[in-house]
Amino acid sequence: MDLARVHTPRGWYDDFVNRLVNCARCPRLVSYRSTVKPLRRYESWSYWGRPVPPWGDLNARVMVVGLAPAAHGGNRTGRMFTGDASAQNLFKALFLLGLSNKPYSVSRDDGVEVRCVYITSAVKCAPPKNRPTAEEVYNCSSWLREELEAVRPRAVVALGELAWRAVLKILGATTAAFKHGEVVNAAGVRVYASYHPSPLNVNTGRLTVETLAEVLRRAAADAGCL
């Protein structure tokens, strides 16, 4: 895959989102995403319940790739890494580096702006128990491939093993074992591995905001963002 860097047109992004939100390739995900029962604290919300669009700086040099939208996060708010605990951990780290203007991400109208960073996921719909099937990951791979070709990042930070494997496969790299802090060069892109900023990983001490920020810092520095 040739990922020579060029300007990413706004027209591509708008067209991409319009196509993405109407995707119905995976019957299990279509059924689940639209029938998630709101948590009590979100009973007043009208859940998004569709494929969740990526967002960020369209001229980004760093692409952050997560697993999939959270049922009560992106699937509720309609924006990836927005409205759940994983999102808050990620944005605390981005804020520490000056890559986000706020240390949180709670809704599409929260005024958050990121610099040099584009945020997306390997799977675009919330999966039951946060576990997409191999077929669902494959079905979504064409979306992520299109994003990589359009945005042409210099660095990718893969949050979690599934995102790591999905990115490397699209870039045509020999799959390297997932290890936090690992770096692989593939198709002219430096791909960084990080544990996912989930509450489980943070609460057990496997990952901290600081160790996540360090991986992001290395990627951003290598990409020329810092």
UniProtKB/Swiss-Prot annotation:
GO molecular function: 4 iron, 4 sulfur cluster binding; deaminated base DNA N-glycosylase activity; DNA-deoxyinosine glycosylase activity; metal ion binding; uracil DNA N-glycosylase activity
EC number(s) given by UniProt: 3.2.2.-
Protein name according to UniProt: Type-5 uracil-DNA glycosylase
Keywords: 4Fe-4S, DNA damage, DNA repair, Hydrolase, Iron, Iron-sulfur, Metal-binding
PANTHER family cross-referenced by the UniProt entry: TYPE-5 URACIL-DNA GLYCOSYLASE
Annotated family: Belongs to the uracil-DNA glycosylase (UDG) superfamily. Type 5 (UDGb) family.
Function, as annotated: DNA glycosylase with broad substrate specificity. Can remove uracil from double-stranded DNA containing either a U/G or U/A base pair. Can also process hydroxymethyluracil (mispaired with guanine or adenine), hypoxanthine and fluorouracil. Exhibits a clear preference for double-stranded DNA substrates, but can also process uracil in single-stranded DNA, with lower efficiency.
Top-level taxon of origin: Archaea
InterPro entries referenced in this protein's UniProt entry, alphabetically: UDG_Type-4/5 (IPR051536), UdgB-like (IPR044147), Uracil-DNA_glycosylase-like (IPR005122), Uracil-DNA_glycosylase-like_sf (IPR036895)
Statement: the UniProt record of this protein carries the keyword 4Fe-4S: yes
The keyword ATP-binding appears for this protein: no
Biological classification of the source: Archaea, Thermoproteota, Thermoprotei, Thermoproteales, Thermoproteaceae
GO biological process: base-excision repair; DNA repair
Record-listed [4Fe-4S] cluster binding positions: 23, 26, 125, 140
Consequence the record notes for mutating residue 68 to D: 10-fold decrease in activity
Annotated thermal dependence: Thermostable.
Source organism: Pyrobaculum aerophilum (strain ATCC 51768 / DSM 7523 / JCM 9630 / CIP 104966 / NBRC 100827 / IM2)
